[in-house]
């Protein structure tokens, strides 16, 4: 996607402890001043390029299972960007257990998300820790500032999708959603 769009990456570095566990990006690195500083130090950004950040991507939870307070990440990164993507490949179960309150992209009540809040994307590989077939995944979108037009999103999505969809994979997403619905999700995440 970065190659196709011409985006220039500007990395936010996570911490790593002495056990080798990759931790979170420190909160101070998510603040507007830190983002501006790393952009100014980025050798890929020249004077003739608009250096305004437009999209942030954070892995949540990390591969080692550490998870962010998504609400806080949005508050901090919302000072710099209008769109946020949480890569939640291993974290599709979080909404279904109160222990993870505010620690996943689609936290809280969608009705509480204001049009002035950032647009949030979340991707979840439902085949990893939910009951979907291999390669199954979800994309969730909570619209806010600078939301992406649905037809534009669908066109971009279809560029990456197969012209021969595998209906058992699609059906497995429906099944995993049904399994997690209601009391089932809490029961399955309590064990």
Predicted features and spans:
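Conserved PLP-enzyme active-site core in the AAT-like
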Residues: 1-191
């Amino acid at each position: 996607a970065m190659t196709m769009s011409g985006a220039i990456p500007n990395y936010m570095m996570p911490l790593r402890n002495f056990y080798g566990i990759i931790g979170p990006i420190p909160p101070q690195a998510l603040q507007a001043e830190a983002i501006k500083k790393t952009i100014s130090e980025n050798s890929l950004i020249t004077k003739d390029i608009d250096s305004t950040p437009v999209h942030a991507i954070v892995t949540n939870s990390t591969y080692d299972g550490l998870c962010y307070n998504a609400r806080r990440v949005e508050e901090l990164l919302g000072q710099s960007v209008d769109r946020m993507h949480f890569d939640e490949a291993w974290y599709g179960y979080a909404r279904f257990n109160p222990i993870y309150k505010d620690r996943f992209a689609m936290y809280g009540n969608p009705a509480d998300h204001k049009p002035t809040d950032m647009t949030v994307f979340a991707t979840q590989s439902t085949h990893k820790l939910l009951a979907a077939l291999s390669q199954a995944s979800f994309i969730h979108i909570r619209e806010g500032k600078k939301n992406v037009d649905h037809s534009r999103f669908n066109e971009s999505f279809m560029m990456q999708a197969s012209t021969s969809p595998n209906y058992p994979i699609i059906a497995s997403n429906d099944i995993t959603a049904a399994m997690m619905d209601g009391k089932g999700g809490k029961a399955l995440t309590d064990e």
